[in-house]
């Protein structure tokens, strides 16, 4: 049985690690090196770092990525500003294990296939940000709501060769009120690739609810920095509920 992964998902901004609320109102988590050492000590399963400066400017902070990778002793996913296969090659050469693509995948779905063919689909994570519009869920990209079904987009990404999907609820992101379960229900039993749910994790029982609705891995930021819970607390609750986790 595959083990459920607990994955801190944090943002890189001005060479600092931060978290946000609804992709705004940023709050500093800490310096790159010290934060990596905390994650190492807490034995998290993986780490996702999204470079939001690069997403806006198109200039990837390779120096910070190198600093992160040197201190990171767990599988590391880097996203933000990736536009070319050469960008991916450089990020992987610096020590990352996977890359996450969002806007580039929307612009050019064939890029997913090209990246998967060159580097292996197992290291290609496609990211979809979702925001509600009334009672509908829409894909959210750089401040714009797209008239595109998140599930349809995810299925297209899967067909193009994505290895995993990172699904983030913008409405729930950073609010610490649990995952968007209505969003998860739309995806339940629809994908063959692993689904990482992100946005809203506030306590271990939130993770149980998400896994019961088909999530394969749990991502979060607030819970691991601004609450009393640690990754171990989440894992222990999952284990009590019968889910396979990596406990040391």
Swiss-Prot record:
Q: Which UniProt keywords apply?
A: Amino-acid biosynthesis, Cytoplasm, Histidine biosynthesis, Lyase
Instruction: Name the principal localization, coarsely classed.
Output: cytoplasm
- Any idea of its EC number? 4.3.2.10
- SUPFAM superfamilies the record matches: Ribulose-phoshate binding barrel
Its localization reads: Cytoplasm
Q: Name one Pfam family in it.
A: His_biosynth
Q: Which reaction does it catalyse?
A: 5-[(5-phospho-1-deoxy-D-ribulos-1-ylimino)methylamino]-1-(5-phospho-beta-D-ribosyl)imidazole-4-carboxamide + L-glutamine = D-erythro-1-(imidazol-4-yl)glycerol 3-phosphate + 5-amino-1-(5-phospho-beta-D-ribosyl)imidazole-4-carboxamide + L-glutamate + H(+)
Alphabetized InterPro entries for the sequence: Aldolase_TIM, His_biosynth, HisF, IGPS_HisA/HisF, RibuloseP-bd_barrel
**How does the record describe its quaternary structure?**
Heterodimer of HisH and HisF.
What's its job? IGPS catalyzes the conversion of PRFAR and glutamine to IGP, AICAR and glutamate. The HisF subunit catalyzes the cyclization activity that produces IGP and AICAR from PRFAR using the ammonia provided by the HisH subunit.
Task: From the Swiss-Prot or TrEMBL record, give the protein name.
Answer: Putative imidazole glycerol phosphate synthase subunit hisF2
From which source organism is this entry? Campylobacter jejuni subsp. jejuni serotype O:2 (strain ATCC 700819 / NCTC 11168)
Query: Which gene is this protein's source?
Result: hisF2
